[in-house]
A protein has these predicted regions:
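Structured secondary-structure scaffolds
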Residues: 1-174, 189-224, 238-243
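Alpha-helix boundary/capping residues
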Residues: 7, 142, 262, 311-315
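NTP/phosphate- and nucleic-acid-binding module
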Residues: 11, 179, 284-328
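Broad structural signal for hydrophobic residues in well-ordered alpha-helices, predominantly aliphatic
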Residues: 47-48, 126, 246-247, 258, ...
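Short aromatic/hydrophobic-glycine micro-motifs
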Residues: 53, 132, 263-264, 316
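Short secondary-structure junction motifs
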Residues: 56-59, 255, 324
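Short solvent-exposed loop/turn micro-motifs enriched in small/polar/acidic residues
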Residues: 62, 119, 277-279, 321-323
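Acidic, turn-prone loop/beta-hairpin segments
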Residues: 64-66, 70-89, 178-199, 214, ...
Length: 328
């Protein structure tokens, strides 16, 4: 409540201020906060609001989200002393020894990182080696944010390699030579991009960050497929810029570097979803002489001529249509 009236020297807060700013829209914190800070916050808010009916809220927080913990294996020497991961050396991935005297150590199960158990990673060392973006990407991609995650150096390396691919993709688009344009191919590309942006935007709003990152992996492959297609540089650049804006909450350093590569104003608004560009698709069963030979995903508004063309090049239906005319 005090944060709502920080400059008030006479009172802890004023009614106008707290009624304007409170309640907090979203509270994000670990489970341990639910039994300490949250409990006291609710207690004081309920107590104050009982004695002053002009306060127009009874709960301090509208929504609560509790994130999981980052976990790591624990290590003990034969005397029962806890050891840091940097003090041990793994052999064949099954057992480990103490670096200082080569004695065998006891491997413990993964537990939330703790100073007392020394199962922590030096963040400065990891950031120096891989960058903050790679670490953030790994943590967000490994599992749903409300679940605990198992720390993995291999996972961080993998995240770092993917982010390098994203940079290379942006560079290739910035240096790409213009292709002859096929409007239909371009239309399909724009439609698919609108679907991706819609999914990512929805997942961010629902705290499904791991789902977002899965979409980014799919987006990367999608862009790679269209690099050598008949899509204009303008359309490719416009959409890769939108993708990098979507990546800002996840990997801000890389995203801003890529946006500068495209000479884009990084302060522009969040990408907007043009739902008119999302083409509805239907499943079309291809029957030949009364038997289903294939099932195709096609746009709902295709003409009969366009459908026939798609069917004629279907790998499953082609052998039944060779040297024959399609009647209906």
């Amino acid at each position: 409540l005090r944060f709502c009236s920080p400059k008030n020297k006479d009172k802890g807060f004023t009614l106008d201020d707290i009624n304007y700013w409170m309640p907090v829209d979203q509270y994000i914190g670990g489970v341990e906060h639910a039994i300490l800070h949250l409990l006291y916050s609710r207690f004081f808010t309920k107590g104050i609001s009982e004695f002053n009916k002009e306060i127009n809220f009874r709960e301090p927080f509208t929504n609560l989200f509790t994130q999981g913990m980052v976990c790591h294996e624990t290590y003990k020497d034969i005397k029962g002393n806890w050891l840091y991961p940097s003090e041990i050396e793994k052999i064949n991935g099954k057992k480990a020894i103490k670096k200082s005297d080569r004695s065998e150590i006891i491997l413990g199960p993964p537990e939330s990182m703790s100073k007392s158990k020394k199962n922590t990673i030096d963040p400065e060392e990891m950031i120096e080696k891989y960058g903050a973006d790679a670490i953030r990407w790994f943590i967000l991609s490994d599992s749903p944010p409300e679940k605990d995650i198992q720390w993995s150096d291999v996972g961080v390396v993998s995240a770092n390699k993917f982010l390098q691919k994203i940079w290379n993709l942006n560079y290739m688009i910035s240096e790409r030579k213009e292709f002859s344009i096929d409007k239909k191919t371009e239309k399909l590309f724009i439609s698919k991009m609108a679907v991706f942006i819609n999914k990512i935007d929805s997942s961010i709003n629902n705290f499904r960050f791991n789902v977002c990152i899965a979409q980014f992996y799919e987006l990367y492959n999608y862009f790679k497929d269209f690099l050598d297609s008949k899509v204009s540089n303008e359309v490719l650049k416009e959409n890769i810029v939108n993708v990098m804006k979507l990546m800002i909450p996840f990997v801000p350093h890389l995203a801003y570097e890529c946006l500068e590569l495209h000479k884009c104003n990084t302060l522009k608004s969040w990408p907007k979803i043009d739902k008119s560009k999302i083409f509805e698709k239907i499943k079309l069963a291809v029957q030949i002489n009364g038997k289903t030979r294939d099932v195709l995903n096609v746009e709902k508004d295709l003409s009969e001529k366009e459908v026939n063309k798609i069917v004629s090049i279907s790998s499953k239906a082609y052998k039944y249509l060779e040297n024959v005319d399609i009647l209906r």
